Each structure stands twice: as structure tokens, then as C-alpha cells.
Regions:
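Conserved phosphate/anionic-ligand binding catalytic regions in large, soluble enzymes, centered on
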Residues: 91, 131-150
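Short cysteine-rich clusters marking metal-coordination/redox-active sites
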Residues: 9-12, 27-30, 40, 47-50
């Protein structure tokens, strides 16, 4: 099989169709049948599990071993990795992983490899391509709230821990909503980590180092078109 494409259709590179109604599709990799709102015009389809399998391994290995304490730096390295497409739920994993790794590496909080790995799996299960627009629930926002859920040990019977976790989601989701038009996972990751930085100070009393001079190198790759000057991270020198 040819190497998977990282832009548009993973199989042929064609621009994907975003549908108003779900259709039944079959994953070209594993054969699973399901309903989907996104497809290749030629008929190719890759399910969420197959779409993110290779990237999950890459992201997990990197965030578990990096010593970097600045969350944007961790995320930027991963977003440039060849296994990570321009758009996709892999960015939810990057957000959660970069945030947790930065917090752990700050030395002010202990987070085990097992807890970080389980968080990534939870985020992957709840992040579905296209649902950011269809349902208004972006997996990147879940990445930050899931990190808080792990750190605080939030469960349904708990009060403050669960409330903080939900507030984290709402605040990231609101910031992302103000950054929409068109959708851009790269921008959303940066926005989410910026909110995560503020949340860490507020709820965990941890002030992470943060790079305030991020400039995007992906502006010419967005199949929906770049927001350019409307984006906080736009660079005229973007590839």
C-alpha cells in the first residue's frame, strides 16, 4: 500500500466532501462499515481508529519522553510530524499530550506514564472528525479538559473536580469558537494551549513557560483556506 497522504484523502489526496447528511461507508483499511459525514469523492474512506493509529503511537512516545516544559514547543514539533495530517482528530491528542507533558516536566505535579496514556485513549475515543462543526464539540477542547480530569481525578460523584473539568472544556470551546472561519486544527491547538496556560495558573497554581511569538508554517496547506490576517498565528512566510 502507498504511503498515507497527510492532506485531504489519506489514500488518494483528493479534496474531501463534507456532507449535510450521513451516508454508509466502508473503511478501506479495516473494512468496518459505519455512517459518516466526510468522504472522498472517489469513494475512499478511512475510519477514525485507522486514521489516527499511527499518529497516536508517535504522539504518545514523544510526550512520554520529552523534557520540554513549554507546551507550544511540544505541540509544534508534533504538528510538523509526517504522520500528522493538516486536519484531523490527531490534534486533540497533541493538545492533551503537550499540555500534560509540560505540566509534568514543570516538576510541580506528578503524572504517571499510565495516566498520560489513558488520557490520550479517552481523548481519541471522544474525538470524531467533522463533529467540531456538526455538534459544536471539538476534540481539541476535550484534550485540555481531559487533562484536568486526569490531574484532578474527576469522576461523576465528585463535585469541584468535575466542575473544573467541565469549566475547562467550556472555556477552551468558547475560545475556539471565536477562532472559527474556516476550521483550522493547527490554530485551535495553539488557542487551546493558551487557555490551558491560564487554567493551569488559576486551578493548579502552575505557571508554565510560554512562547508568545508563535508563527504558523502551515497557512498554505489548509484545504478550507487560511484565515490569514484574521489568525493570530498567521505568517506571510508560511509554507
Amino acid at each position: 500500500m502507498e504511503e498515507a497522504k497527510t492532506e485531504n484523502c489519506m489514500i488518494c489526496g483528493s479534496v474531501l466532501e463534507y456532507l449535510k447528511e450521513a451516508i454508509e461507508v466502508t473503511c478501506n483499511f479495516c473494512g468496518k462499515k459505519e455512517a459518516a459525514y466526510i468522504r472522498c469523492p472517489i469513494g475512499h474512506y478511512v475510519c477514525e481508529q485507522c486514521h489516527g493509529k499511527a499518529a497516536l503511537d508517535v504522539i504518545k512516545e514523544f510526550v512520554l519522553t520529552t523534557k520540554e516544559r513549554e507546551p507550544f514547543s511540544i505541540a509544534e514539533v508534533l504538528m510538523r510530524h509526517p504522520q500528522v495530517p493538516f486536519l484531523g482528530c490527531e490534534h486533540a491528542l497533541i493538545t492533551a499530550g503537550a499540555f500534560l507533558a509540560a505540566l509534568r516536566n514543570s516538576g510541580k505535579i506528578q503524572i504517571s506514564d499510565e495516566k498520560m496514556s489513558r488520557t490520550l485513549i479517552r481523548v481519541q475515543k471522544q474525538s470524531i472528525a467533522g463533529y467540531c462543526a456538526l455538534n459544536g464539540c471539538c476534540g481539541i477542547a476535550i484534550g485540555i479538559s481531559a487533562a484536568f480530569g486526569t490531574i484532578l481525578g474527576a469522576t461523576c460523584p465528585k463535585d469541584r473536580e468535575s466542575a473544573i473539568t467541565m469549566h475547562a472544556f467550556v472555556r477552551v470551546a468558547e475560545a475556539i469558537a471565536n477562532d472559527v472561519g474556516p476550521m483550522c486544527c493547527k490554530s485551535f491547538v495553539r488557542t487551546a494551549l493558551g487557555v490551558g496556560y491560564n487554567l493551569a495558573k488559576e486551578y493548579l497554581n502552575i505557571e508554565l513557560p510560554i512562547d508568545r511569538n508563535i508563527r504558523c508554517l502551515f497557512s498554505k496547506q489548509n484545504p478550507h483556506g487560511c484565515r490569514e490576517s484574521k489568525c493570530l498565528y498567521f505568517s506571510k512566510n508560511g509554507r
